């Protein structure tokens, strides 16, 4: 099959819609279940490239959770600790494979934004991954293969309409790519830049310490940024993104947005949050929403009389600003990546507030000296890659 008809394009009024191969070749993917839409497939093919490159760069299973053609999260398949399992709503005693851990961590980076996501796996989708996905709100998944048990589980989601796409892992795109805007065709070379440790050699700060875990996290940040709508900044901790700031016109707004997400990720691990007792039968999205509001300045929306009873078994104490600051002050070892240079040191200042110990960015600003000076002030290790990673 060299063409797949779609219900509509980005919006219901954009008809007809289809995906096809211009050269007449067969499509490199198969729809095993459901009927994916235009944006679903944009998410699928962008997310597949991300997880494929993560696997190539690190040798570890990789997963991503995509929404509107940007990753809400991406991660590698390291084991989950007991706190991770509680924060990510893993069922007690659940079997967890490396690829399942990768997806759970990717979705756990920003559970609020991953609502209705598109999942991407670098490796075969197994029953453990499918069982976790079954209980999450998700639009679809792409993987190079599916076990029989996993496929049977996934086919029960959304009343049997869950989108399951299998992509040929051997497929490689043409070296030139095209897209039309306003009837005008744009053509460019496919972004086939290879992201590996050779990009991390130019350490420009006084602190040259770059442990293996930080190198891995830098690669994760850079590959995530390569497939995130620009401008973009990414915070990574222990082989998973913890905050992705996408599609902002201002670099500092990217850094703030991603930093706020990273702060929320860490605050979800606060003992007061772990102690929240939810009413029986509450759905995961409702728990996520309640936690998000509880951590915000609008916490009274879930703590006021008449409100908390709908969510909690007992009224929790508020997490005070002082408690938040004290908890966040413990956060260290975070890696921050940027798809283009930091123009001013204020980005470093903001990143440091969310625990940044390592920064990777292209360099090339006329204010690089100021950026380096700010990193030196806090003992941050910073590498300049010389490679911009815009994505549109």
Protein language model regions, located:
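Conserved helix-loop functional segments at active or binding sites
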Residues: 53, 227, 264-268, 353, ...
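Glycine- and Gly-Pro-enriched alpha-helical subdomains that act as flexible
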Residues: 72-112, 242-344
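Flexible, glycine/charged-enriched surface loops at secondary-structure junctions
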Residues: 57-65, 165-167, 230-237, 267-278, ...
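Active-site-proximal loop/turn and secondary-structure-junction residues that shape catalytic pockets
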Residues: 70, 125, 237-240, 248, ...
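Active-site loops and adjacent core secondary-structure elements that bind or stabilize anionic groups
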Residues: 1-199, 214-232
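C-terminal binding/interaction regions
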Residues: 72, 117, 121-122, 135-165, ...
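Nucleic-acid 5′ end/cap handling module spanning
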Residues: 220, 228, 235-238, 245, ...
